[in-house]
């Protein structure tokens, strides 16, 4: 190879000596365009035409070049992740990537889904938005949202100054939404301490005596029954009772209910992942019982994942500046949502004239609610799934930051459900979908998917009903019926861009419907209260019969 390179180099040198004029022309390709006519002036039109031609050729080659580079880069990253996973997970990773081997044509197979018996594989990786925000074009979109927030603030200040004759720097809506916060704090501490102690104690007590017990089945049923009582009674009814008994405002209720659901899912994952290990240990008659340490369980309770592991990939250091920035962005999103409600939502519903509930009022309300609904959707995603989870991941040096994927590129609802919230999807996939198939049969995949949709829809509707103090199953209908239908109709076989457009259109419309219906019902119950409401009054829509001015 070296000899061939030397010979080719000598041939080129000899040819350059034989044809010095040709070599000179090759080294000066612009000489022809810069030749001056007899009058000594450069032909500007010819120079501009040459430049335009070169620019057009470069633009024509640009997409092919970017596509080729992107393809090779995806291959490189995929191979690198495979090698890293094989080093970290041994045989488990080999099994996983043998499944992915059949997807060679898919260069973006980033979910690294392990077989059900192996569970989720955690790999150190950054969040997608952290990578995208390093690109100037994407960062400009982020700057546009900041500029829009500044305009919201200026608009509020100007309107208040014109109406009141002074600057009104009040956040009455924000202070009302997060009212009675001390109750939230002590309720959270009770939930945390009970989740930290009861599941771990029950599991430890069951595991240490399981192999020596003369009645292991009765022992397992007894401890399982106690665990169910804790999940349903303590974590289930306890926080709900506090929320209703102390009449907490909406945002304070949301914090408690969200943490309630999170602790229930965490406790279930801890028991679900460790019970099979104890059973296998007893089956193999091992002298040691695989019981996690208290520190491992405590770390899991704060880690931004719902899948328990004894250890996770960890980053070497904590970037406290990064943590501060993420928390600042979370608070910025809170104020952003406040100004959206103050400038877009409140005037919309306050200015609806006194007229009965009709299709005309409903249609106008839905389409006027699309813009604020979509903005709230984006801000919720950015504040929680990106900023909040990344802040805790950085403080805990948690390495796997794939809390979401590129859901905005989805051409099907099935892909959207998988990529919008990876944290919750992983829990539903392994502990609801896969366990359903294991318990019944692998032939009932449609029934398993239906069960997962039902569980998710019921939990979402429960959270909204408790937080808003009324039952109005709009989200349940959209999620359980339309969402499930779209999941089967607009499936993964849809790859054309038009399906991405349709997905975004339906997503925009759905958020407008949710914001319109729930806001109308909220204002109706505020302005048309009942003296002695019965249970049916909490589930009967008040906005359909109440005539009032918002």
From Swiss-Prot:
Function field: Catalyzes the formation of fatty acid-cholesterol esters, which are less soluble in membranes than cholesterol. Plays a role in lipoprotein assembly and dietary cholesterol absorption. Preferentially utilizes oleoyl-CoA ((9Z)-octadecenoyl-CoA) as a substrate: shows a higher activity towards an acyl-CoA substrate with a double bond at the delta-9 position (9Z) than towards saturated acyl-CoA or an unsaturated acyl-CoA with a double bond at the delta-7 (7Z) or delta-11 (11Z) positions.
Membrane-side (Cytoplasmic) residue stretches: 1-138, 207-218, 277-319, 396-443, 491-496
Effect of residue 407 to A: Almost abolished cholesterol O-acyltransferase activity
Enzyme class, spelled out: transferase
One GO location term (cellular component): endoplasmic reticulum membrane
Transmembrane segments: 139-160, 181-206, 219-244, 253-276, 320-352, 370-395, 444-468, 475-490, 497-528
Outcome of substituting residue 456 to A: Abolished cholesterol O-acyltransferase activity
Notes on activation and inhibition: Cholesterol O-acyltransferase activity is inhibited by nevanimibe.
EC number: 2.3.1.26
Residue sites binding cholesterol per the record: 137
Record motif FYXDWWN motif, residues: 403-409
Record note on what altering residue 263 to A does: Strongly reduced cholesterol O-acyltransferase activity
Impact upon substituting residue 400 to N: Low expression, loss of enzymatic activity
Subcellular location: Endoplasmic reticulum membrane
Catalytic activity: a sterol + a long-chain fatty acyl-CoA = a long-chain 3-hydroxysterol ester + CoA; cholesterol + an acyl-CoA = a cholesterol ester + CoA; cholesterol + (9Z)-octadecenoyl-CoA = cholesteryl (9Z-octadecenoate) + CoA; cholesterol + hexadecanoyl-CoA = cholesteryl hexadecanoate + CoA
Keyword NAD: no
Chain residue ranges for the region called Disordered: 1-39
MF-aspect GO terms: cholesterol binding; cholesterol O-acyltransferase activity; fatty-acyl-CoA binding; identical protein binding; sterol O-acyltransferase activity
Binding site for an acyl-CoA: 415, 418, 421, 425, 433, 445, 456
Subunit details: Homotetramer; composed of two homodimers. Interacts with UBIAD1.
Membrane association type: Multi-pass membrane protein
Outcome reported for the amino acid change (mutating residue 386 to A): Abolished cholesterol O-acyltransferase activity
Organism for this UniProt entry: Homo sapiens (Human)
Sites of Phosphoserine modification: 8
PANTHER family: STEROL O-ACYLTRANSFERASE, STEROL O-ACYLTRANSFERASE 1
Modified residues (N-acetylmethionine): 1
Name of the featured protein: Sterol O-acyltransferase 1
């Amino acid at each position: 190879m070296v000899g061939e390179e030397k010979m080719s180099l000598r041939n080129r040198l000899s040819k350059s000596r034989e044809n010095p004029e040709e070599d000179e022309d090759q080294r000066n390709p612009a000489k022809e365009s810069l030749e001056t006519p007899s009058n000594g002036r450069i032909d500007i039109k010819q120079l501009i035409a040459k430049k335009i031609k070169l620019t057009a050729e470069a633009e024509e080659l640009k997409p092919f070049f970017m596509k080729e580079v992107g393809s090779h880069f995806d291959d490189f990253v995929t191979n690198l992740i495979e090698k890293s996973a094989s080093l970290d997970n041994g045989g488990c990773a080999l099994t996983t990537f043998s499944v992915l081997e059949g997807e060679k044509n898919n260069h973006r197979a980033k979910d690294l889904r392990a077989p059900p018996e192996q569970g989720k594989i955690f790999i150190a990786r950054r969040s997608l938005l952290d990578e995208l925000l390093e690109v100037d074009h994407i960062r400009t979109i982020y700057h546009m949202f900041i500029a829009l927030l500044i305009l919201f603030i200026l608009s509020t200040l100007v309107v208040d100054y014109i109406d009141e004759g002074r600057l009104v720097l009040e956040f009455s809506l924000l202070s009302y939404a997060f009212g009675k916060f001390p109750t939230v704090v002590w309720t959270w501490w009770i939930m945390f301490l009970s989740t930290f102690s009861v599941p771990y104690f029950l599991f430890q007590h069951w595991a240490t005596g399981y192999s020596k017990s003369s009645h292991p089945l009765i022992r397992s049923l007894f401890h399982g029954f106690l665990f169910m009582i804790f999940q349903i009674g303590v974590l289930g009814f306890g926080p709900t009772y506090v929320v209703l008994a102390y009449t907490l405002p909406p945002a304070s209720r949301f914090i408690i209910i969200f943490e309630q659901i999170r602790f229930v899912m965490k406790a279930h994952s801890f028991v679900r992942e460790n019970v099979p290990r104890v059973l296998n240990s007893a089956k193999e008659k091992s002298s040691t019982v695989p019981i996690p340490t208290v520190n491992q369980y405590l770390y899991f309770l704060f880690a931004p994942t719902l899948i328990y592991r004894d250890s996770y990939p960890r980053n070497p250091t904590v970037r406290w500046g990064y943590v501060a920035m993420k928390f600042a962005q979370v608070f910025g999103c809170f104020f952003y949502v406040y100004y959206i409600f103050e400038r877009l939502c409140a005037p919309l519903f306050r200015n609806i004239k006194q007229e009965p509930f009709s299709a005309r009022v409903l249609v106008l309300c839905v389409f006027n609610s699309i813009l604020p609904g979509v903005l709230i959707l984006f801000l919720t995603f950015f504040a929680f799934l990106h900023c909040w989870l990344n802040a805790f991941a950085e403080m805990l040096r948690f390495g796997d930051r794939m809390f979401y994927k590129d859901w905005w590129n989805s051409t099907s609802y099935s892909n959207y459900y998988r990529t919008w919230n990876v944290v919750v999807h992983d829990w539903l996939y392994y502990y609801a979908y896969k366990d359903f198939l294991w318990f019944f049969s692998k032939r009932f995949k449609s029934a398993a998917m239906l069960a997962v949709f039902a569980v998710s829809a019921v939990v979402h509707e429960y959270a909204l009903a408790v937080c808003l103090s009324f039952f109005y199953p709009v989200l349940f209908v959209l999620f359980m019926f339309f969402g499930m239908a779209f999941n089967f109709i607009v499936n993964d076989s849809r790859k054309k861009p038009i399906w991405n457009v349709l997905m975004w259109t339906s997503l925009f419309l759905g958020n407008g419907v949710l914001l319109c219906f729930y806001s109308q019902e909220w204002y109706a119950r505020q302005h048309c209260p009942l003296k002695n409401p019965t249970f049916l009054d909490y589930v009967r829509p008040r906005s359909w019969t109440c005539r009032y001015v918002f």
